[in-house]
Amino acid sequence: MXVNFDETSKNNDKLSNNITDWQQNIEKSATSFLNHFIRISPKQNSNKKELLAPNQDIYLRENIRLRLQLAIMAVPRQQNELYKQSLEAVSSWVRSYFDTNAEVTQNFLKLVDGLTDTSIYVDVPEQLKSLTLLDKYLNRTALDVQKVEIEADKAIDTMPQVEAVKPTQSESQQ
């Protein structure tokens, strides 16, 4: 059976009314059916979007959300490879399954591509200057401490002092 996917020939599609041509009529009917209803073609255009079942859309969005969370968690740990792999996976999925002509999708992809190009390594000094200053402050010598003089009020010194009265033996026995 010769199936023509590109064009159908009009003259071979006509069925005969003769009962003895039943095999040719079945073949022509099957060929016509295959040419018009079932199309099998290789994927030549890579711009075509992947098709998802309606319930699979939820899983795709959750996978994208998970990858974005992995990228977020990789930042404080400075795991640059995990960060980049997660963002590249998100970018790939969005390009494959979403309409890249939509403005929202284009803005999202620009943002993800910009984040992918950003390094998450933080350059911090090995030793802070405040540590040496704090060390000097805590280890300063006694000469650095200023003397504080306390002057007593002379009025307190000139007051008569009352002598303490000692109890007698008879008072202490009671």
UniProtKB/Swiss-Prot annotation:
InterPro entries: HemX. To E.coli HemX C-terminal region. It holds the Pfam family HemX. It comes from the Bacteria. This is Uncharacterized protein HI_0602.1.
